[in-house]
C-alpha cells in the first residue's frame, strides 16, 4: 500500500520539477519579447521588454513644442502605460497556462 503512495509522490515531484523548468524557460522567453505602446496617434512610442523594462522611447519631432512640455510629458506617460499594459497581457497569456485554476491574486499571471 505504501509503495503505491510513494510512486505517486515521486511522479508528482517529477511533474512539479518539469513544470518549474517549463515556467523558467517561459519566463526567460518572455524577457526576450518586446511590446510597443503608443500615444498621440503614434507621435510617442515606448518599447518595453517582457520583463517590464523600458528599452526605448521614440518621440516624433513635430510633437516637441517648447511652449507645451506638459503635453509631451502626458504623451510619454500614456505610451509607457500602454506598453506596460501590453506586457501584462503578454505575461498573462504566456505564464497563465501554468497557473490555470490556482486562483492567484490579480496580476500574478
UniProtKB/Swiss-Prot annotation:
Is Secreted one of the keywords UniProt gives this record?
Answer: no
Q: Per its database record, what is this protein's job?
A: Binds to DNA and alters its conformation. May be involved in regulation of gene expression, nucleoid organization and DNA protection.
- SUPFAM superfamilies given for it? YbaB-like
Q: What is this protein called?
A: Nucleoid-associated protein BcerKBAB4_0019
InterPro entries per record: YbaB-like_sf, YbaB/EbfC
HAMAP family, A to Z: DNA_YbaB_EbfC
GO MF annotations, alphabetized: DNA binding
- Per the record, the major location class is cytoplasm
Per the record, its GO cellular-component terms are: bacterial nucleoid; cytosol
**Subunit-level organization:** Homodimer.
What Gene3D superfamilies does the database record attribute to this sequence?
Answer: Nucleoid-associated protein YbaB-like domain
Subcellular localization: Cytoplasm, Nucleoid
| Keywords, sorted A to Z | Cytoplasm, DNA-binding
